[in-house]
């Protein structure tokens, strides 16, 4: 069975067997504890096994995976510590993506694909507004209308508002103040660059599953230096991607080597102020997506950043350092 060497402590090797890779994991530790280094090791080793992956690059640290490294004093010292005589430097196949379409390959998603639950989270809607948005999606579906971009959704909201009496029989009262609040939130999202993200053509799943001539899986890197300043768009897109994989990939059951790996950096951003409905959807997706051959890894400072409903599904737990007893218990 293939395995990945993660590190060593007190002459004990830490190995991750490939059969555990689709049972998900978490990497925790404070700033400077080498969480990103650990993540990059996993990305490299997964690539060698032919496993494509998707990772959010928060500070530009992951881009170097596409370049061949070179030896220096720190690396020599590290090799001695690990009792490794040699180390082969190599560049890994990478693909760069960008929601804001500034430098890399554009990443797009239609409003219909995002769905009302995740979109309500992006917009920060309350319970009443979320219910109205959900009704608008249902009405559009009944009328065979595809909501491709923000303009489509705005037009649909205005249409429903203007004909509220007609729809109130089946969907309840849709107060104009609530509709206006949703429209204001959409306007703010548009100003943040949401009009670039919510458009077509959408990403093709096959573009993420590529391998190079050596059989190495591509590491798909999402540029997040700008995206990190838009936490609602960041969290919504990554959750959409996870749902997209789950809904699109066929069932394959437990496999010796997973088909794909997904890395959520700054995982706390996914769960800040999350609704119970969306959390329940994420928990279900994480629990079931392993049968699609997908491994999911969360990277964050504190293991308590990840809700218990999610962390209970994570079998591989790597911690650089843990201070509080409550954190140690979670890991």
Predicted regions and their residues:
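P-loop NTPase motor domains
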Residues: 43-52, 60-287, 310
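Pre-Walker A (Motif I) flank of P-loop NTPase domains
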Residues: 12, 20-25, 216-220
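Conserved lysine of the Walker
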Residues: 35
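N-terminal pre-Walker A segment at the start of P-loop NTPase domains
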Residues: 1-13
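A short helix-turn-beta junction within AAA+ P-loop NTPase domains corresponding to the substrate/partner-engaging
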Residues: 309-321
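The conserved Walker
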Residues: 27-31, 303
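Post-Walker A alpha-helix
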Residues: 38-39
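Conserved small/polar residues in nucleotide/adenosyl-binding loops
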Residues: 325-331
């Amino acid at each position: 069975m293939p395995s990945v060497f993660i590190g060593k402590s007190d002459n004990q090797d830490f190995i991750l067997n490939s059969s555990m890779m689709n049972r998900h994991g978490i990497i925790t530790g404070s700033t400077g504890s080498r969480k990103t280094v650990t993540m990059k090791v996993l990305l490299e080793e997964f690539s060698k096994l032919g496993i494509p992956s998707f990772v959010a690059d928060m500070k530009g640290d992951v881009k170097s995976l596409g370049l061949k490294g070179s030896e220096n004093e720190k690396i020599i010292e590290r090799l001695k510590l690990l009792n490794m005589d040699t180390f082969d430097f190599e560049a890994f196949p990478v693909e760069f993506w960008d929601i804001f379409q500034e430098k890399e390959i554009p990443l797009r998603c239609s409003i219909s694909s995002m769905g009302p639950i995740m979109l309500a989270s992006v917009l920060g809607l309350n319970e009443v507004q979320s219910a109205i948005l959900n009704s608008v999606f249902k009405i559009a579906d009944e009328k065979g209308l595809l909501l491709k971009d923000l303009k489509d959704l705005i037009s649909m909201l205005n249409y429903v508002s203007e004909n509220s009496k007609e729809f109130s029989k089946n969907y309840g009262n849709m107060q104009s103040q609530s509709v206006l609040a949703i429209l204001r939130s959409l306007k703010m999202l548009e100003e943040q660059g949401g009009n670039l993200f919510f458009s077509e053509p959408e990403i093709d799943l096959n573009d993420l599953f590529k391998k190079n001539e050596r059989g190495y899986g591509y590491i798909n890197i999402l540029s997040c230096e700008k995206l990190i300043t838009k936490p609602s768009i960041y969290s919504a897109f990554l959750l959409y991607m996870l749902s997209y994989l789950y809904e699109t990939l066929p069932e394959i059951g437990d496999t010796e080597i997973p088909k794909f790996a997904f890395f959520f950096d700054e995982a706390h951003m996914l769960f800040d102020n999350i609704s119970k409905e969306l959390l329940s959807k994420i928990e279900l997706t994480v629990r079931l997506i392993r049968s699609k051959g997908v491994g999911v890894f969360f990277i964050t400072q504190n293991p308590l950043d990840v809700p218990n409903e999610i962390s209970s599904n994570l079998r591989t737990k790597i911690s650089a350092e843990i201070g509080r007893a409550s954190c140690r218990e979670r890991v």
